[in-house]
């Protein structure tokens, strides 16, 4: 799907809110990464927003995802949206995925399928992100994301979604670059580290 998108000169978009947005940052302008990813960033969804509760409020705000999609993306038939949402339940990610689908773009969801299936949608449609996806990449994390149980603590620690998601997507980047070379693209557009000599 991603190779066909590149071959047809279509656009690859990425989106995630709050910590899920770290994967969009990982794919964007990254040493060793491909110059093919177009992130949809919303200032109020970034981790440097204050107060720290703002990102949670904004990702639950019905209508904000549609507005972001309309103002920051130009979804077309054949485009691909990679959307990262661990729970898959919040309106902003659901609406961006729905906007992409409405415009005949493909949707790849990076999510925790067992977590998402254990919660209800916060969007009026009742949908969760995985229900809008053409391809689901399941991070197989624990429900609630944290994975380490410490004696005497009710809340687990050590979330896994970011590191697993980054590993999955960078593996896909490597496979896409290989496919591009195999198809005759001698120099796929790869970022060179700004911290290397030369």
Give, region by region, the residue ranges found by the protein language model.
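Glycine-rich phosphate-binding loops that contact phosphosugars or nucleotide phosphates
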Residues: 7, 13-173
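Internal, active-site/partner-interface "lid" segment
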Residues: 145-149, 178-198
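A short, well-structured juxtamembrane/interface segment
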Residues: 1-8
């Amino acid at each position: 799907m991603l190779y066909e998108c590149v071959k047809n000169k279509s656009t690859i978009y990425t989106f995630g809110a709050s910590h899920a947005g770290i994967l969009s940052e990982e794919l964007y302008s990254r040493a060793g990464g491909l110059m093919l990813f177009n992130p949809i960033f919303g200032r109020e969804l970034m981790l440097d927003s204050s107060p720290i509760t703002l990102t949670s409020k904004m990702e639950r705000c019905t209508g904000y995802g549609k507005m972001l999609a309309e103002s920051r993306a130009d979804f077309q038939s054949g485009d691909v949206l990679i959307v990262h949402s661990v729970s898959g339940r919040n309106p902003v990610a659901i609406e961006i995925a729905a906007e992409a689908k409405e415009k005949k773009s493909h949707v790849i969801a990076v999510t925790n399928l067992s977590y998402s299936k254990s919660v209800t949608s916060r969007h009026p449609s009742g949908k969760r992100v995985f229900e809008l996806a053409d391809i689901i990449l399941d991070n197989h994390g624990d429900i609630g994301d944290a994975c380490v149980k410490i004696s005497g603590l009710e809340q687990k620690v050590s979330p896994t979604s970011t590191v697993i998601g980054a590993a999955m997507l960078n593996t896909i980047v490597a496979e896409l670059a290989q496919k591009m070379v195999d198809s005759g693209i001698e120099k796929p557009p790869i970022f060179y580290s700004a911290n290397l000599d030369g």
